[in-house]
Every structure is written in structure tokens, then in C-alpha cells.
Amino acid sequence: MKLIIATRKSQLALWQSEHVAQILKNTHQIEVLLEGFKTKGDVLLDSPLAKIGGKGLFTKELEESMLRKEAHLAVHSLKDVPSFFPQGLVLAAVSKREQSNDAMLSQNYKDFLSLPKGAKIGTTSLRRKMQLLLLRPDLEIISLRGNVNSRIEKLKNNDFDAIILAMAGIKRLNLDKQVNFVYEFSKDELIPAASQGALGIESINDEKILELLKCLNDENALIETSIEREFIATLEGGCQVPIGINAELLGDEICVRAVLGLPDGSEILKDKRMIKKNDFKGFGESLAKEFIAKGAKELLKKAESMI
């Protein structure tokens, strides 16, 4: 049997797809091919992600290729995957999670506190912008799009004093070797995006395919990301609004951190909870409902109007 993986063509997307392909080859001794596609999010590089808006910016074209029967599965950064799937497609697996925190890359400054007043920080994310301004209101946060290499290049050209990337991508592509300093944010400083660091394997809803993909599943990643995705789905929040949610398994307990608010950090809702591992089902939804009772929906509408 031959499996075809639909993938974006970015360096990180190809790494992720090749990583999954290798596991499938080793486990089942089957042929696995990669088919590259450009998504809307890859093409529209002039506008900040929040202004392009809409869900599925980095997934829609891959999903369409599966529905046309050109591919059997697609490998996504799970944080880019909307909560609901087109008919005929399913979330087949969530693979073992890489580090889920954010990091600051810089040529001249070894950590966040050493940044000078008014330092220029590059990031695409309103979630990061909001939390960075909570920590350092003096910073100038500038939208930064493009692939990882172009972002590193802009940093080296001194367009920015620092840029913010996910630790998962930094580790997968060995980006720490390309810059002088990498400062890892704690999850209390910067709460990550839902599912950050996890890979989501989406596939056609076919029993034979789903059976082959079972080997990719990681129970801990599934538990953590189900809380996070439930929280986002209940709030009906996409990647264009500033929401951070992270569930971290610590033995038989789970530490859940959540934040949402306005992009400038002037108004936020934030919480941190410890729950028993066995109580994870439904917790993301119940936490989101608590946030909604405190005015989360109104705050997110206000955030959208500021974009």
C-alpha cells in the first residue's frame, strides 16, 4: 500500500511531514510519499494573520486535496487546525508533543529583561503581543510574517532587537545554532497557543487508513490538547484573537493556564488551575464557560474591533 501525505512547502511543514512519514514507513513497511501545496496563509504574506482572518488559513488547501482523493492524510501544526472538520475528514492522531513554550531569539540580548526600553520585537501573534506588553509595556511589537529563514535574516539585519518563535520549531529546525541568544519564556510569563508543539494528523475517514495512523497517537498529548482545543471551541476563538491556553501533565495532575484579552494588554482575563488527570474530560469547556461568565465573549469582540 502507498500513503500520500499532503503538506505545506515550508521548511518546518516539510520536517513535520517527513517525521510522520518515517514513523509510518518504519512501523508498517509501506511506501509514503509527500505532495506539496501552498495554502492561503503561505501566499498572503503582506498582511498580519489577524487581518487576513478566517479559520483554516494553513489547512484548507490540504483538506481540499484529501477530499479530491489526491492525498490520504495531512500533517499540521495542531495549533493551526480549526476545531471542526469538513465532512469526510477526521483528526486521526495527535503525536507526541514537543516543548510547548515560546522563546525569544536575539543577536545582542541574552534574556527578556536585558532588552532596552522601546526595543523592537517581531511576532505574528496577537497572543504573544498582548502578553509581552503585559510584561514590558515599553516594547514596540511589530508584525513579522514570512518563513522561518526570512525571519532569522531580518533579525540578523538588525530590523528587530528580538523575534519570538515557538520552541518546538526552534528545536525541530536547530534554529538555536543560527542566532547568538535564545531565551525560553516560562509558561507563566507567556502562556502558549492551544496545541502549540503538537502535530495533528488529519485524514480521510477510512477505517484502513485510521488503523495505520494509530501508531502516531500519544495519550498525554491527546489529553493536554483536548483540554486546550475544547477551551478554544467553546469560546469560538480562532487564531486572529489573543487567546493563550496550555495544559501540562505533571504526574497524576494537570496544570492549566489560560489568558485572553485585548491585543494591547489593557484588559485581560487570566487563570491557572491544578486538576486531577482523571478529571480532564470536559474541563476545557467548563473553564471557557467560567471565562464567558466573566465577560470573555465581549472582550474578544472588542479585541477583534482593534485588529
From Swiss-Prot:
Q: What is this protein called?
A: Porphobilinogen deaminase
Give the species: Campylobacter jejuni subsp. jejuni serotype O:2 (strain ATCC 700819 / NCTC 11168)
Cite any additional comment in the entry.
The porphobilinogen subunits are added to the dipyrromethane group.
What is the catalytic activity of this protein?
A: 4 porphobilinogen + H2O = hydroxymethylbilane + 4 NH4(+)
Give the matching Gene3D superfamilies: Periplasmic binding protein-like II, Porphobilinogen deaminase, C-terminal domain
Q: What is its EC number?
A: 2.5.1.61
Q: Which GO terms describe its cellular component?
A: cytoplasm
Example of a GO MF term = hydroxymethylbilane synthase activity
What domain of life does the UniProt record list for this protein's source? Bacteria
